[in-house]
Amino acid sequence: MNIEEIASEVSNSISLAKQIEPFSKRGLVLSIQEAYDVAKVVRQKLGPAEIVGQKIGFTNRNIWNIYEVDEPIWGPMTKSSVSYSDSNFYKVDLNQFCEPRIEPEVVVCLKQKPEFNTDNPEISLDWIAPGFEIVDSIYPNWKFSLTDAIASGGLHGSLVVGKKFKVSDDTEKDLIDVKVSLYRNGRLEEEGSGANVLDGPISAVRFLNRGLTKIKNQDPL
């Protein structure tokens, strides 16, 4: 299978919410570059959509062994996949996804584009917000390789952005210390902090900015 054929299968899977066998299980070993090339074609095949941001996945090193990955990934978010709720409450129709899961998020909006070809750019923030992402696996039982995940668009389903907050000079440090608890039916399922996100959410943005320079055909932030 070539990149076009793989992208067609992925886009059909997403459109129909129908899972497929991971490409890595079929002996199709993609390089990181090839996987991002597939994801770009997938985005085109899913139809015209304004890209409004990037999601960063697998930023928590503590789960890398669970999913057998060894680095974060990213994928585009479109105007149709992002919703806003100042009340911090939002109902999502899960029938549009294959095997959805929920992840609490720190959402950041950049005031300006960071310098592209540098390891430690200044990150200028416009606002921050709590949010949650519905991540989705087109591969059964969430079993896939790193490049399988990249090819599917970084496992992005949808993002809900909560109430926006102003930023200050202390925001980067404060986000490292912020705590979050995830409940289901009133029962605590998981706890974490901003430090789980590649040592801090703004550190994750710097990682993304660097990563985009290392992969061909990627648009800067």
Regions found by a protein language model. Give the residues of each.
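Catalytic-core "active-site belt" of small-molecule-metabolizing enzymes
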Residues: N2-R206, R210, K214
